[in-house]
Amino acid sequence: MAAEPQPSSLSYRTTGSTYLHPLSELLGIPLDQVNFVVCQLVALFAAFWFRIYLRPGTTSSDVRHAVATIFGIYFVIFCFGWYSVHLFVLVLMCYAIMVTASVSNIHRYSFFVAMGYLTICHISRIYIFHYGILTTDFSGPLMIVTQKITTLAFQVHDGLGRRAEDLSAEQHRLAIKVKPSFLEYLSYLLNFMSVIAGPCNNFKDYIAFIEGKHIHMKLLEVNWKRKGFHSLPEPSPTGAVIHKLGITLVSLLLFLTLTKTFPVTCLVDDWFVHKASFPARLCYLYVVMQASKPKYYFAWTLADAVNNAAGFGFSGVDKNGNFCWDLLSNLNIWKIETATSFKMYLENWNIQTATWLKCVCYQRVPWYPTVLTFILSALWHGVYPGYYFTFLTGILVTLAARAVRNNYRHYFLSSRALKAVYDAGTWAVTQLAVSYTVAPFVMLAVEPTISLYKSMYFYLHIISLLIILFLPMKPQAHTQRRPQTLNSINKRKTD
């Protein structure tokens, strides 16, 4: 009896469109990745068209909302097929909460429904679809929508359910005084610029963009007259888009070469685990983790360029008078690669997710904000065991790094030479620490993670624990935190 024919590649294992399968076969790239890139490139051209031909001055806000939503829905269905139903169900459930829930509870209900649904989908990908390796990863858009749903719910709660004097300055600026219409809600969550790869953004900024007030609003915030402009300028995003597309192209080339040469599976092969020396393992781990970055640089920078091409993402004017289009930037590659502290690295990686975590968790929880923020970040990313190894290790490293900095940094500030030595040393330590910490994040499963850490003798865990145990830490109050509000600021001024 003849054996059942096997598919020629894994590229058919997708619920999205198979129209581009010949291109997938030609390039040797999985079909879901081809669909993603093609959708983002089409979105880029659509964004230019959207900005030029559907300008706010000549096109109503409703039309702009509708077009952005229709394109977004089409892209989601093209990439994910029937899996896109999960996205639409979550959006509709949370809009029902937006309409029916009281403003005092709207943020709680939205948060638990969105995070709960996302977690169920994460679990199904692991335990039903076996880590999702042979199926399209539909969780990406769901994660972005979850961020937007919860961000909007908290900002509506701030605007309608809290007193102005109880808000921080940032919460006051972003508070929403009127619940969005159904069209505005759909457009904010499903617009074609960010539905596939993000990033998350604030509802006020998005509505200002749709209504044509986004750039002027940002210029007024930075006081454009003091920047040397005699009339209100009209900055073009074209230069920023070209620059970001250049970064995208370089990232793609690195992904096709470096990432293929140093796959993460190298970290569990026989040579690495049993034969390589410890210094060789340190260096090789760093190289492999560096090689895993270009795909993130590519996806996030391209998503940023798409938003900019549509005219969204203007952040103001820098100190040199240059227009900045980094409001939605998700990373700062230079600061990542030159980071001299764990904190600096994290602040410049997945920036919009860090902003979301700060908005819905860190600034609001009364106890243990760092630990709870790490836990929320892990839950949002998924339920792969590797994520939890990364975030638990990250908590240890963060606390240890804080202790070292507080106890020793001031000794190196007396001269430029000492500061240079300190910066060089902390750069090397930071890069090695990040490589060690994030390796489980890309390995996903328990067995390869334990194998890697055993081969590294759990060195960073041990060092971090020793530092935490034996170096004096700044005393942390375990009583309820009091976030800085407009009321507390005004009270301090009058004291």
Curated annotation (Swiss-Prot):
PANTHER family, per the entry: LYSOPHOSPHOLIPID ACYLTRANSFERASE 1, PORCUPINE
Reaction catalysed by this enzyme: a 1-acyl-sn-glycero-3-phospho-L-serine + an acyl-CoA = a 1,2-diacyl-sn-glycero-3-phospho-L-serine + CoA; a 1-acyl-sn-glycero-3-phosphocholine + an acyl-CoA = a 1,2-diacyl-sn-glycero-3-phosphocholine + CoA; a 1-acyl-sn-glycero-3-phosphoethanolamine + an acyl-CoA = a 1,2-diacyl-sn-glycero-3-phosphoethanolamine + CoA; 1-(9Z-octadecenoyl)-sn-glycero-3-phospho-L-serine + (9Z)-octadecenoyl-CoA = 1,2-di-(9Z)-octadecenoyl-sn-glycero-3-phospho-L-serine + CoA
Keyword Transmembrane: yes
Active-site residues, Swiss-Prot/TrEMBL: N350, H381
Modified residues (Phosphoserine): S488
An example Gene Ontology molecular-function term: 1-acylglycerophosphocholine O-acyltransferase activity
Pfam hit, one: MBOAT
EC number: 2.3.1.-, 2.3.1.23, 2.3.1.n7, 2.3.1.n6
Topology in membrane: Multi-pass membrane protein
Family matches, as InterPro entries: LPLAT_7/PORCN-like, MBOAT_fam
Gene for this chain: MBOAT1
Family: Belongs to the membrane-bound acyltransferase family.
Role played: Acyltransferase which catalyzes the transfer of an acyl group from an acyl-CoA towards a lysophospholipid producing a phospholipid and participates in the reacylation step of the phospholipid remodeling pathway also known as the Lands cycle. Acts on lysophosphatidylserine (1-acyl-2-hydroxy-sn-glycero-3-phospho-L-serine or LPS) and lysophosphatidylethanolamine (1-acyl-sn-glycero-3-phosphoethanolamine or LPE), and to a lesser extend lysophosphatidylcholine. Prefers oleoyl-CoA as the acyl donor and 1-oleoyl-LPE as acceptor. May play a role in neurite outgrowth during neuronal differentiation.
GO CC, any one term: endoplasmic reticulum membrane
Regulation: Partially inhibited by thimerosal.
Tissue: Expressed in neutrophils.
GO biological process: lipid modification; phosphatidylethanolamine acyl-chain remodeling; phosphatidylserine acyl-chain remodeling; phospholipid biosynthetic process; regulation of neuron projection development
Pathway it works in: Lipid metabolism; phospholipid metabolism
Keyword annotations: Acyltransferase, Endoplasmic reticulum, Lipid biosynthesis, Lipid metabolism, Membrane, Phospholipid biosynthesis, Phospholipid metabolism, Phosphoprotein, Transferase, Transmembrane, Transmembrane helix
This protein's name: Membrane-bound glycerophospholipid O-acyltransferase 1
Subcellular location: Endoplasmic reticulum membrane
Top EC class, one word: transferase
Positions of transmembrane segments: 34-54, 70-90, 126-146, 180-200, 238-258, 297-317, 371-391, 426-446, 450-470
